[in-house]
Regions:
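SAM-dependent transferase fold signal centered on methyltransferase-like domains
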Residues: 1-404
Length: 404
C-alpha cells in the first residue's frame, strides 16, 4: 500500500514519544478540545510541522476505525491506511483458515492481517513503505500478536528466497484509489508474478485477498473463490490454492460466519416470476450480495423449508415467497402491502396504510429521487412509519421492512 508523504522518520514511530502523543491527542479530541488548542499543546511538547500533522491524523483516524476494529481506541492508522485495512472480523475469519501454518504476508500495509497471528504460527510481513511498516509493528503490539515486519519489495528475488520455508504465501495487493481493479495486472504486487516467483518451492498454497470487482473469469488458475460479505455488503474476494482450497466456490457471510460451499454442477436458481403472478409473495427477500455475486442462489435456498421464486436479478437480487422465513442468506425481508402501477397509486397506498415516509429502492437518478420522494410524502401524516417502494417489471411494490 502506498502512503502519502508525511515527511516524518519511520523510526520515530517506534519511539514512546509518538505513541504518547497520539494517545494524548485522541483523549483531547474525545473531550471535544478545539483543533487549534490541540496544535498549541503539541507545540509546547516540541511537536510541530509534519510531526504534529501526522500525530493528529493518526489520532483522528481512531474515531473512524470504530467500524473496523474492536480496539479502535488504541490502533495506529493513517486515513489511507484505514481505508484499505481489512475489517477485523474479515481478517480473523481468513486467518482462522490459516491457523497452524507459517505465513509470509506480502504487502502488509499497516498490519490489518498480521494482528491475528499468534506465537505458534511463524509469520513474516513484508511492506515496501517504511512508514506503513512502522505502523504495522505498532498495531501488532496493540493486538499482542506475533509477527516480524520487514521493509522490502515482495518481488525482490533475494528477499523471496528468504521465504522458501514458509507454508503459505498471503497477499492483499494494493490498488490505487481511482483504480477499478478488474484485472490482476492492475494490482501491486501482481498475484501472477507472486505465484511465479514464490512457486519455485512446494507450499501448502497461496492466498490472495482481491478487490470485490474482479470477476472469476479473470482468475486464470485453479483455486477456491470465497465471496465475503460483511455487514450486508459484498466486501472481498478471497482466493485459496493448493491444500487450502476446499471447493470451487464459497460464500462467507460476516458477522456470524455462515458458509456455503459448492462444486460444479451448480444448482439452478429459483424459477422467475412477476408481481402479479400466482406465485408472488407477499414476502420479499433481498439476497446477500455475496451470494448473488457468487451465483450460488440455488445453493443458498436449497435447504430452506420454503419455496422461493426469483423476482429480480441485477443491481439487487429479490426473491418472493408466500411465507416468512429467517436466514443469513437474506440481507433484508419485506412484507408487500400493495402492488400498483402508477406513482399516484403509490401515494394513495402510503396514505391509506398510515405511512409518513417512503424510501425508493429502484433505479432512479439522484435528482429525480428527491423530487419523486417529496411528491409521495407530501401531505402524509407525521410519524416514523416508513415504507419501502420497489419497482419490478413496471409494477410498484409498497412494502414494509421486517426483522430477518
Amino acid at each position: 500500500m502506498k502512503e502519502e508523504n508525511y515527511g516524518v522518520e519511520p523510526r520515530w514511530i517506534s519511539e514512546e514519544e509518538f505513541a504518547e502523543a497520539v494517545d494524548r491527542v485522541f483523549d483531547w479530541l474525545s473531550a471535544s478540545t478545539p483543533l487549534k488548542v490541540v496544535r498549541e499543546r503539541l507545540d509546547k511538547m516540541g511537536l510541530t510541522g509534519e510531526k504534529a500533522r501526522f500525530v493528529v491524523d493518526v489520532a483522528r483516524t481512531r474515531f473512524k476505525a470504530k467500524v473496523k476494529f474492536s480496539r479502535w481506541r488504541e490502533v495506529f492508522f493513517t486515513p489511507a491506511g484505514l481505508r484499505w485495512a481489512t475489517p477485523e472480523d474479515v481478517g480473523a475469519a481468513l486467518q482462522e483458515r490459516l491457523k497452524g501454518y507459517s505465513m509470509a504476508d506480502l504487502g502488509a500495509g499497516q498490519g490489518g492481517q498480521v494482528i491475528h497471528r499468534q506465537e505458534s504460527e511463524e509469520t513474516v510481513a513484508v511492506e515496501i513503505d517504511p512508514l506503513n511498516a512502522s505502523l504495522a509493528l505498532r498495531n501488532v503490539e496493540v493486538y499482542s500478536a506475533e509477527a516480524e515486519i520487514v521493509v522490502g519489495d515482495a518481488l525482490d528475488e533475494s528477499l523471496a528466497r528468504r521465504f522458501d520455508p514458509f507454508e503459505v504465501i498471503f497477499s492483499d495487493p494494493y490498488r490505487g484509489p481511482t483504480s477499478t481493479s478488474r484485472t490482476l495486472e492492475e494490482l501491486e504486487p501482481n498475484p501472477l508474478e507472486v505465484m511465479k516467483l514464490y512457486g519455485r518451492v512446494e507450499r501448502a498454497g497461496f492466498v490472495f485477498e482481491l478487490p470485490p470487482q474482479i470477476r472469476e473469469e479473470r482468475i486464470p488458475f485453479d483455486a477456491e473463490l470465497e465471496y465475503v460479505s460483511f455487514g450486508g455488503e459484498y466486501n472481498r474476494l478471497n482466493v485459496y490454492t493448493g491444500e487450502l482450497r476446499r471447493c470451487s466456490k464459497s460464500v462467507l457471510i460476516l458477522p456470524g460466519g455462515f458458509r456455503i460451499e459448492a462444486d460444479p454442477p451448480y444448482r439452478a436458481p429459483p424459477s422467475p416470476t412477476d408481481p402479479f403472478s400466482r406465485e408472488f409473495g407477499p414476502y420479499l427477500y433481498e439476497v446477500d450480495p455475496a451470494v448473488a455475486r457468487a451465483s450460488l442462489l440455488g445453493e443458498a435456498v436449497a435447504e430452506l423449508p420454503r419455496e422461493f421464486y426469483l423476482l429480480e436479478r441485477g443491481r439487487r437480487t429479490l426473491l418472493t415467497s408466500p411465507q416468512p422465513i429467517s436466514s443469513p442468506v437474506f440481507r433484508r425481508r419485506y412484507r408487500v402491502l400493495r402492488r400498483v402501477r402508477t406513482l399516484p397509486e403509490v401515494r394513495e397506498a402510503l396514505k391509506e396504510e398510515g405511512f409518513s415516509k417512503a424510501s425508493l429502492r429502484f433505479r432512479i437518478s439522484p435528482e429525480e429521487y428527491w423530487r419523486v420522494r417529496r411528491s409521495l410524502e407530501e401531505g402524509l401524516p407525521e410519524g416514523r412509519e416508513k415504507a419501502t417502494i420497489f419497482k419490478v417489471s413496471g409494477v410498484y411494490l409498497v412494502a414494509v421492512m421486517e426483522e430477518v
